[in-house]
Amino acid sequence: MKFELDTTDGRARRGRLVFDRGVVETPAFMPVGTYGTVKGMTPEEVEATGAQIILGNTFHLWLRPGQEVMKLHGDLHDFMQWKGPILTDSGGFQVFSLGDIRKITEKGVHFRNPINGDPIFLDPEKSMEIQYDLGSDIVMIFDECTPYPADWDYAKRSMEMSLRWAQRSRDRFDSLENKNALFGIIQGSVYEDLRDISVKGLVEIGFDGYAVGGLAVGEPKEDMHRILEHVCPQIPEDKPRYLMGVGKPEDLVEGVRRGIDMFDCVMPTRNARNGHLFVTDGVVKIRNAKHKSDTSTLDAECDCYTCRHYSRAYLYHLDRCNEILGARLNTIHNLRYYQRLMAGLRKAIEEGKLESFVTDFYQRQGRDVPPLNVD
């Protein structure tokens, strides 16, 4: 992987990630394909929304179908027939979200398989091996996603262990002679001094890109913005910056304003299946009875398949009848909305008009622009 930085506007960056499997224009949003599928979508449909890279889930793909089935096909690209780059998370977040059925040690994490209850062990070395078999274009280190809230002492211990696991991830990745990219993950909860230690330690180890982890886990938005404003300038300028698990459209806008290049989140797909649709002036809750006879399109400014062909009344009807097509059409729209938003942000940065774009984005939703505390 090669990262090219073209231009900046304030702290916002316009560039691209270059892989053997294709080019990803940044800032970029990555749809989530947890089980080797972006729910309800074929790879061609996902590509048609404008997505150039997707995310796969190491933990779930390890449990089902497993490494052996994956290797029979070649890798995850061959298994799911996605031709572009794939980023896989390390499995850490899923393991730590298991709560009481897992035990963290210095060596790794003991837990019970949520499918059948069998005892399983996952550590940095195993995570690197699974992601190698998946053929991930971007591999994420195995870390502990520090929960929120966490006091300073716990956050410090967690961050320090994640740094030790980062070195172990790096060592196993290198011993596998993996030619793809490896990203470090910055931890430290909402504490700036801990984030400083994490960034410094990861940069000393050396990675192809750096993710900001442990945000969007329940902390106030002001804390997320503050940490991004503090951390992003410390990440080497020639490396991509990835904000994990984020988020709402406004979170993408605010991340870009603070220097983030990459995002992923289940929100556009999950919300689509629940009838929660993102449009230029906010959100349409398609289950609301007011849409029963509405012949207008979902979003007059959207060029997606759904908006070009169907009315709000039809989408309301499909949802009321629990038709699978409704979830699919909603997903197509939400994914396209996110990609159109990213394309708009990229164009605004190119033209040096980002703050004008941001102001318009919020004004059209009747909201104020959040403060930006950067030099």
From Swiss-Prot:
Record's cofactor remark: Binds 1 zinc ion per subunit.
Residues holding substrate: 89-93, 143, 187, 214
SUPFAM superfamilies assigned to the protein according to its UniProt record, in alphabetical order: tRNA-guanine transglycosylase
Annotated GO CC locations: cytosol
InterPro entries: ArchSynthase1/Queuine_TRR (IPR050076), TGT (IPR004803), TGT-like_sf (IPR036511), tRNA_ribo_trans-like (IPR002616)
GO molecular function, a single term: tRNA-guanosine(34) queuine transglycosylase activity
One Pfam short name: TGT
This protein's UniProt keywords: Glycosyltransferase, Metal-binding, Queuosine biosynthesis, Transferase, tRNA processing, Zinc
Catalytic class of the enzyme: transferase
Chain sites annotated for binding Zn(2+): 302, 304, 307, 333
Subunit structure: Homodimer. Within each dimer, one monomer is responsible for RNA recognition and catalysis, while the other monomer binds to the replacement base PreQ1.
Annotated family: Belongs to the queuine tRNA-ribosyltransferase family.
Name of the featured protein: Queuine tRNA-ribosyltransferase
Native organism taxonomy: Bacteria, Pseudomonadati, Pseudomonadota, Gammaproteobacteria, Enterobacterales
Gene this chain is encoded by: tgt
